[in-house]
Amino acid sequence: MSENRLPDYLDHIQQAATDARSFVERMAKDDFLADKRTQQAVIMSLIVIGEAATKVMDGYVEFTQAHADVPWRSMRNMRNRMAHGYFDINLDVVWETVQEWLPALLQQLPAVRQDADDEDRNDNCERGISDDC
């Protein structure tokens, strides 16, 4: 049986979203649009978010269905646009994503992560490999 990586993937999403938000903290949109280094850092964070979301979608289908309010598909699609359409990245969309979409995601993640921990604990109990039952 393979190791449950779901909590790790959710942690990657949480960390990358937190990083992206911190990169633009106290920054005006015009400053972001003029700062290539910050743009690159934010874009990389969005790619990490999308990569982890793809792993969750591919490996934990029932979990994503149970958490359909989380924008898994949007995270994956954003990653694909960033990774494969680099010369066509719309920085206005990147800014909007970090300012509006990521705060909402960061509010959702603690409960989603708790559900993943509960599910992992229940699986371990069923397999008899945990004393925390």
Which ranges hold each PLM region?
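Solvent-exposed interaction patches of small proteins and small membrane subunits
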Residues: 1-133
